[in-house]
Amino acid sequence: MKKRRSKKERQELLQQTIESNPFITDEDLAEKFQVSIQTVRLDRMELSIPELRERIKHVATKQHEEDVKSLPLEEVVGEIIDIELDRHAISIFEVKIEHVFKRNQIARGHHLFAQANSLAVAVIDEELALTAKSTIRYIRPVKLGERVVAKARVEDVENDKGRTVVKVRSFVGEELVFTGTFEMYRSSNYSEEGNNL
C-alpha cells in the first residue's frame, strides 16, 4: 500500500505537474495524486495557481495576436496556444453544451471542422488565406466536456498548384478524433480579378 504524501510534498508535485502541463484538468490531477477534486482546488488556491481556463488564456498571450495575420484571433474557433507561421500551430477547443446535440451530448461535426479549418487559415503567413479544398475524416465522436487539441502542420508551401497544404490532427487526450488536409490559397496567389483562384 502506497504511503500518502504530505500536503507540502503533494503541493510541490502539483505545482511541478501544472508547470510542465498547464492544460491538465483538476480531475486528472485528482486522479494522479489520489485525492478529491476539492483538495486539488484548495491546493491550487493556496499556491495561487489559476483554474484551467485562466491558465489557457495566459498561455495564449498577446504575442499570438501579433503573429496571426490572416484573421482576427476572435474568429479562430478554439484558443491558439502555440503558433509559428507557415510551420505549425496548436489550438484548444472546449466542447460545451451549445456545441452538442441535445439528444446524445455528442459534438456537432462542424465545430471540429471549424476548429481545424480556422487553425489552417491562422497558420498561413499572409494577410489573406482562403480554403480551396479540404479532405476530412471524423474518427470518433467527441462528447460534451471533452477538450479537443488541434495540431496543424504546414506540409507544402506553394505547391505545383500554387497552394499551401496544411494537415490538421485533432486529439482528445492521446486519442486521435479528427484529421483534415486543407489546400489553402494565399494572398500572394490572389489577383484583384480573381484569376489565380
From Swiss-Prot:
CDD domains in the cross-refs: hot_dog
Keywords noted in UniProt: DNA-binding, Fatty acid biosynthesis, Fatty acid metabolism, Lipid biosynthesis, Lipid metabolism, Repressor, Transcription, Transcription regulation
Gene3D superfamilies found in the cross-reference section: Hotdog Thioesterase, Winged helix-like DNA-binding domain superfamily/Winged helix DNA-binding domain
Biological processes annotated in GO: fatty acid biosynthetic process; negative regulation of DNA-templated transcription; negative regulation of fatty acid biosynthetic process
UniProt-listed InterPro entries: HotDog_dom_sf (IPR029069), Thioestr_dom (IPR006683), Transcription_factor_FapR (IPR017275), WH-like_DNA-bd_sf (IPR036388), WH_DNA-bd_sf (IPR036390)
Top-level taxon in the UniProt lineage: Bacteria
Alphabetical list of SUPFAM superfamilies matching this protein: Thioesterase/thiol ester dehydrase-isomerase, Winged helix' DNA-binding domain
GO molecular function: DNA binding; DNA-binding transcription factor activity
Matching NCBIfam families: PRK04424.1
HAMAP family on file: Transcrip_fact_FapR
Main function: Transcriptional factor involved in regulation of membrane lipid biosynthesis by repressing genes involved in fatty acid and phospholipid metabolism.
Family of the protein in this entry: Belongs to the FapR family.
Protein name: Transcription factor FapR
Native organism: Bacillus cereus (strain ATCC 14579 / DSM 31 / CCUG 7414 / JCM 2152 / NBRC 15305 / NCIMB 9373 / NCTC 2599 / NRRL B-3711)
